[in-house]
């Protein structure tokens, strides 16, 4: 099965290797780039880390936190902290639903990108909430990306994995009608409901893995026996 994996360059080679170890003919392309920014760490009772990219930045800068809520097991593994909690589903909406009461009246700081979900920001309704932008996301739409879109148009891939809503938007902006039709006829995976929603706006039905991780994607693809 030829699988196209869309995720930032910093994490792409590791993911491709993992898929190939599982027997997939894996390819990859970054449709976004990450631009890291300077930031300070304010006093807080709880920290929220929403991605592996944010966790990696904190680790590289030697930031040690106390109590952390992390989105994703891989994110949690990268964090230096006394305690790390995880929502039952690895998305911002579930984090809000499950931890809002715990965070009520607390000082909460969220380390994230400029393109994060609005759900986390709703914590400002119950907590002394601050958002720290540790990196910005910009779309990549150069020659490399256009070549991949052409391969999608021509039916080269059996499956494509979108790992974020921004990545989905970046690719879709390069898609003509033939590309959109091709996406409707291959197996599309979205890691999480927000990404699936972006694809659905263009009439593309995406499957969502039970666990919003690349391990979950692998299990989903294996279950389809394509």
UniProtKB/Swiss-Prot annotation:
This protein's record includes keyword Lyase: yes
E.C. numbers: 4.2.1.75
Gene3D superfamilies: 3.40.50.10090
Record's keyword annotation contains Lyase: yes
GO aspect biological process, one term: uroporphyrinogen III biosynthetic process
InterPro entries: 4pyrrol_syn_uPrphyn_synt_sf, 4pyrrol_synth_uPrphyn_synth, UROS/Hem4
Catalytic activity as recorded in UniProt: hydroxymethylbilane = uroporphyrinogen III + H2O
Coiled-coil residue windows: none
One Pfam family matching this protein: HEM4
Keywords on record: Lyase, Porphyrin biosynthesis
Pathway assignment: Porphyrin-containing compound metabolism; protoporphyrin-IX biosynthesis; coproporphyrinogen-III from 5-aminolevulinate: step 3/4
Listed GO MF terms: uroporphyrinogen-III synthase activity
Function: Catalyzes cyclization of the linear tetrapyrrole, hydroxymethylbilane, to the macrocyclic uroporphyrinogen III.
Family the entry assigns: Belongs to the uroporphyrinogen-III synthase family.
The name this protein goes by in its record: Putative uroporphyrinogen-III synthase
């Amino acid at each position: 099965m030829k699988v196209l994996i869309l995720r930032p360059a910093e994490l792409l080679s590791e993911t491709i290797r993992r898929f190939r170890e599982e027997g997939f003919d894996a390819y990859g392309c970054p449709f976004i780039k990450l631009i890291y920014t300077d930031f300070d760490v304010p006093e807080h009772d709880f920290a929220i880390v929403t991605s592996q990219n944010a966790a990696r930045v904190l680790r590289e800068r030697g930031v040690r936190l106390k109590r952390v809520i992390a989105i994703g097991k891989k994110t949690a593994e990268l964090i230096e902290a006394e305690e790390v909690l995880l929502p039952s589903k690895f998305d911002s909406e579930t984090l809000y639903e499950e931890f809002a009461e715990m965070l009520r009246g607390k000082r909460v700081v969220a380390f994230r990108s400029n393109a994060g979900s609005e759900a986390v920001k709703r914590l400002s309704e119950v907590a002394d909430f601050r958002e720290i932008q540790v990196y910005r996301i910009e779309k990549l739409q150069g020659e490399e990306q256009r070549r991949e879109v052409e391969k999608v148009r021509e039916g080269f891939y059996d499956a494509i994995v979108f790992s974020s809503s921004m990545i989905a938007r970046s690719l879709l902006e390069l898609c003509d009608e033939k590309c959109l039709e091709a996406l409707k006829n291959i197996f599309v995976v979205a890691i999480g409901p927000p990404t699936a929603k972006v694809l659905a706006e263009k009439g593309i039905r995406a499957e969502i893995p039970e666990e919003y991780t690349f391990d979950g994607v692998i299990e989903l693809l294996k279950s389809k026996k394509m």
